[in-house]
Swiss-Prot record:
Subunit structure of this chain's protein: Homotetramer.
Protein name (Swiss-Prot/TrEMBL): Single-stranded DNA-binding protein
Start and end residues of each stretch annotated as Disordered: 108-188
MF-aspect GO terms: single-stranded DNA binding
Keywords assigned by UniProt, alphabetized: DNA-binding, Plasmid
Originating organism: Cupriavidus necator (strain ATCC 17699 / DSM 428 / KCTC 22496 / NCIMB 10442 / H16 / Stanier 337) (Ralstonia eutropha)
Amino acid sequence: MASVNKVILVGNLGADPEVRYMPSGDAVANLRIATTDRYKDKQSGEMKEATEWHRVSMFGKLAEIAGQYLRKGSSVYIEGRIRTRKWQDQSGQDKYSTEIVADQMQMLGGRGGASDGDSDSGTDRSASQQSPASAQRSAPTGQRQPPARRQPAQPPSNGFGDFNEDIPFARPAALDGIPFRNDGAPRY
């Protein structure tokens, strides 16, 4: 039977990305991403939060983009896979480290993440390890320039108008900014 190793995270960076370059010249970025679950405590009735921290690694152009555009507090969508590495510490003890190896990323919120107040919601800010052509960004010299704005696509006219507002499986507004295929289905 086939197996699946797929991770999807939507969270915030706990620190600026750490970007290094391998001898081959390829970039490697390490990120710490926090995800927070909110739940109601059955005993007290209070809303509580549980935060999980995730180590995320990126390679190549995706790592360069993360290093250039992400900052502490940036909200980000990540797709990737779980990888566990085994290594030995100075005393020879075996240690294990579990991380997510990202192959897709989309920056959420305004340009520059939580540190900038300006919103740039009409801009395509997604990058993919699998399709380098879509991840290509012109490298500005000296100063960052905002990407060109895209015009929103007009929905096809099917004669139902805004009928989908009442459909229970319509895409929730909370998922705005998360990459979907052209037909509206999520990329799983």
